[in-house]
Amino acid sequence: MTTFSPASCWPNPFDLSFVHGEVRTDGRTLERLTVRAVVPRGDELLLVHSRVNGDLMFPGGGIEAGESHHVALARELLEECGAELREVGGLLGETREYRAAREPGFDAYCIRSLYYLCRIGDQLVAPQPQPYEIRLGFMPGWFALDEALQTNKTQLAGPCPQWTARETRVLAQLQRWHQQGIFDHG
């Protein structure tokens, strides 16, 4: 069973970077900080499935002004999954996605995502999705790690959102940890 501890960081957190297209990452970068929830239950993970794109992603999103990471995780879990956040464990790792900036004066736009181990309440209520989440057909569900990873790998073979590569690499890291006995979510 994955354990929750007050430790602020997982023993060996992952650190992954992605560059989408021609991007100058050593110039002025505008950063957007996001949080993502890794919620294990038995042999499964709580993920959000896009019925439009077919991919799976971890619940999460941007941190609003004045929000702590904990508050942002709670808001995103309720919006996307109808889940009540009960506990935040350690930081499992982070990703950085760079793409060309659209804003004047910046060379790159970076989405920095922090992945936290989370525990939720037993009951899910109706999600409260944002309009874009409704357009993408977001639907929460419990998925086996191997199944989720294979689903996203299949999606990567065709046109898919840029975030699919990020989520696939994180799922692959969790699978490696699981195989090494580090992330035993069962």
Task: Kindly give the residue locations of the regions a language model identified.
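Acidic, metal-coordinating catalytic segment for phosphate/diphosphate chemistry
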Residues: T2-R36
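Short, P/G- and charge-enriched loop/turn segments at secondary-structure junctions
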Residues: H20-G27, A101-F106, P129
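Nudix hydrolase/Nudix homology domain
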Residues: G54-D55, V125-G186
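Short connector loops at helix/strand junctions that flank enzyme active sites
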Residues: R32, P40, N53, F58, ...
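Active-site segment of metal-dependent pyrophosphate-handling enzymes
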Residues: A83-L124
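Short, well-ordered beta-strand micro-motif
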Residues: V39, L117-R119, G141-A144
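Conserved Nudix-box catalytic region and its N-terminal flanking loop in Nudix hydrolases
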Residues: P40, E44-A83
